[in-house]
Each structure stands twice: as structure tokens, then as C-alpha cells.
Amino acid sequence: MWIADGWKDYEVIDSSKGEKLERWGNYTLVRPDPQVIWDTPKTHKSWKKMNGHYHRSKKGGGEWEFFDLPEQWQIHYKDLTFNLKPFSFKHTGLFPEQATNWDWFSEKIRNAGRPIKVLNLFAYTGGATLAAASAGASVTHVDASKGMVTWAKENAVSSGLKDAPIRWLVDDCVKFVEREIRRGNHYDAIIMDPPSYGRGPKGEIWKIEDAIHPLIKLCTQILSDDPLFFLINSYTTGLAPSVLTYMLATELKKFNGVVD
């Protein structure tokens, strides 16, 4: 198990009764987490001094309740700076646990000894994009949401990476990869963090159980002859790690790599 223990601006303070108490920089948030099944006493003082509380609705969704919380603030991870702002579905614009992935591939990029081209699909607010760019890679950042790409650009500016070699694209990820195949473009590394369900900018429907394997197959056609890595992150509970391992091992066999 990898643990994101390099944070100074983020920590899980406590958890109980389906909720997590977290510190994001100078502010404390309470958010629901279905994996917190224990019913321990909420004795930590920060439970009573929270700055934001996301209440899940029985009908689905939910809403935020704020207490002296700014609309936006920043936290830092090593050389990177992220702009946070709570929005729908309990999100803040960052998944701190992803820092383990950032550290892993950043070391690979730095030690590659050659220029590395990275494709980041379903790239969200750009955590992986900025980590890869900071490590020295040129990055193509693709997400279907214009708002998320704008947010990622803001994070790049805040991180001092405004002029880094990053291409920002609002596009359907599958259609983009298909076009890259036709163009003959190749990448040394691919990162993807696909949602369980989503829609492209023109209403394209994405369901991970149906679409992830075909996408992996497509991506093998845009990998360079000596790829550095292929990283998939998924929070979909119905998609077991063993299934993803099988897909990657099957489709990437010709590259003679190791699947972890």
C-alpha cells in the first residue's frame, strides 16, 4: 500500500460515523465517506470548529454548510500550489491521496535521461499534469470540462508553471486518442483518472465498465516504442484492481513492462 505521507498542508485528523475530519491548509472540513463504518466518539476539538461541512442528502447529492471559509484558498505540495474551492458532490478540486502517484512518476521522469512526452486523460484540475511538468516532462492535458481545464491553468500559474510545455485541451478523451492515432502522434507516458460515469463536451457518454478496456487498447497505439509508464487511477468500486491489472498486462504485453 502506498501512503501519501509527504503532505504538510493536508491531513485526515479523525473519522467516525461515515465522515472524515480533514485539514486543508488553515481550514478544517467535514466530508462524508462511505468507507468510514466505525462509530467512535467524535472527541477531537476540530469537530466543533469546522469551517465547512458537506451534508449528504437522502435523495442523492447534498450541500455545503460554511463557517468562516473563504470562497477559495491555496495549499501546497512540495513545489506545487493548488487553488481549492468546495463545489458539488463534496469535492474541493484536489484528491490529496494522488500525491503518491505524483511522486512515483516524477522520479521516473527525472531519471529517464531523455525528453518525456506525457498524455494526461481525464486530467481534472491538473495535479498530475503539474507534477509531470515540474519533473521536466512536456504534457498534453485533456479533460471534457472547460471549467476544470481553466482551473488547472490557474493551478499552473500558482505553481510557477505558466510557461511550462503544457497543452491544455477541452475534449472528449476517447475521441482525442482516436484522432492522435490518425495523426501518428505518440507519447512516452500515459496517465488517466477516468470517472465511473461522465459526459463529453458534446454529450458523449462514458461508463467505465464498458469503455475502459477499449480505451486502453486505443492508447497502446499512441505509446512510443519505449514507453516509460502507463498509469490508471480509479475510484470505481465495481472495477477491481485485478481486472485493471489483467487489462494492462494483456494490452501492454508487447512492451515487456511490469504491471504493479
What is each residue range found by the language model?
Residues W38-D39, H44, G203-D260:
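C-terminal substrate-binding/active-site "lid" region of AdoMet-derived donor-dependent transferases
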